[in-house]
Amino acid sequence: MKTRLLTLILILLLALPHTALAGEPQIELTRSQKGVRTSTDVLLVAMPVATLGIAIGKKDWKGIGIGVAEAAGTMAVTYGLKYAIHKRRPDGSDNHSFPSGHSSLVFTDASFVMRRYGWKFGVPAYALAGYVAWGRVYGKKHDTWDVLAGAAIGSAIGLLCTKPFMKNAQIAPAALTDPQTGQFISIGIGGTVNF
């Protein structure tokens, strides 16, 4: 099971750089714009790899499967819309601007991390996702609507499909009795979660 899951992850990670291989820009970019574009391509791969590292460190095998499924679902929705809408990119390189694939994937990752592992991992992930979205606009690959749509798609999938990881959760049945009479009152479930 773990071998198949890791193979699927490797295939998805190898496919990610392909999303950055759109046609050549039809406008002149500054050195800064080219550098920011490259950094967004790097983060497109680095963020899921870091998330994978967190999950492996926590031995969260189920979470890895959920994350891979969310990434695949995000790619399907995003590319379905890209090929249905045919919006021209600001740099003129192709007609697949809406929605931003980079934004949708990194916001799926950030939402997954925030929901699954908490704010200590989630806040930096959202900051990086915000940088990627900004960088796609600055690098003339998208306009603001493209990255907002990508962020909305990614965040929705990540937040709706992820459950918090509670490795240290303990749940136990509890019977309550009246201290005066010793008679049974109700049954409940109690528990603790250690983070």
Show the residue positions of the predicted features.
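Hydrophobic alpha-helical membrane-embedded or membrane-associated segments
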Residues: V49, E70-T74, G150, G154
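Interfacial segments of alpha-helical transmembrane regions
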Residues: I54-G73
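Hydrophobic core of alpha-helical transmembrane segments in multi-pass integral membrane proteins
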Residues: M47-G53
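Residues at structural and domain junctions
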Residues: A50, I66-G67, A110
